[in-house]
């Protein structure tokens, strides 16, 4: 909260210059129109005039007006080019400025600065060695990571038999749990255009996460949040229709670039997975309350 915000300062500065350019362009347009309009009567007078001296005077006035119009047009072209450049930079910055965070959120460079907000139940520590999750799955012949590695490389796996059925059952449970909470179930597109990607994440995040379809303006989603939020791009919502409470299922695809060292064993850091998501579109003043409801839904779904 106390950090310097150079990007915010820059966008404010660029916005002020952009508005000044707009103002100057409008002023020049008005002056150009006035001069062009003034030439009409002068041409009429010139056509009817027999006095050579008067004709020369009228022609000189017309030429002066035309020269002024030309000068205004050249200046307008410069200003409009600057205006476009400023607008592009403003948009670039706006894509990278995140939402405001709650004052209670701890500030720090990484997740080691996180604090425990609330605890539900107490962890049970058994008196025997705890097998790793993939060891349990392998004991049921429920996972084949070696074959997946040969087929697609690291970060993929086959689920088999009852483990595959359990996977589907958990997804169905999560879906029905949210539907019972009054959320509308949605299956969104699993790909999206680049402008939607830019609207939901920064370029460094996009580069680290997203798979791009070669030769197409399409990206595989890293989470259904992307297309769920993208559904409202360029839309104005009726406040009376809020809140919109939505729950979505999707497969998710992530490069996991730069994630090395963050629990790489097993099926944590993988390139393909499925999940159930919660999305609420609400009034800003209701955001904190909905956040509380959403994380409580996550806890209760696991009880």
Protein language model features and the residues they cover:
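TRNA-recognition modules of translation machinery and tRNA-sensing kinases, especially anticodon-binding
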Residues: 119-302
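N-terminal alpha-helical targeting/anchoring segments
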Residues: 1-123, 138, 142
